[in-house]
Amino acid sequence: MKVAAEAARRFLLARHLLAPARSVAGGLDGVLEVFRTFGSIQFDPIAVAGRNHDLVLHARVAGYEPAWCDVLYERREIFETTNKALSLVPASDFPWFRLGIGRKGPRFHAAILAENAVVAERVLGRIRAEGALSA
């Protein structure tokens, strides 16, 4: 099967909800539609040019407002978890992540911190002194 480059471009832009621009209806339902379509959106709380999830949603949801994600958090319709990287995920997908979250519980994180206590303290010290840092 041969697909023309232009057809492939149109397909990929539509599949990633980028064509036409901001074609997803505005509001909380539109934001949830993007989360459900993608499964997750990488989350980066540090805003160099803007927080990643806000940039992703702004490009796809008409009139996107960052406060909409806060509302979805409060309503427990999205949550943070690790999905290769820290990500925001629709709460409806929680059952798929539950086992992995359980495996990486408090003992898992305590063991990592114990093994890397010197480095962890150095990083925390810099954050206390300088504020948020990029990776």
Can you name each region flagged by the protein language model?
Residues 1-133:
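Phosphate-backbone binding and catalysis cores of DNA-processing enzymes
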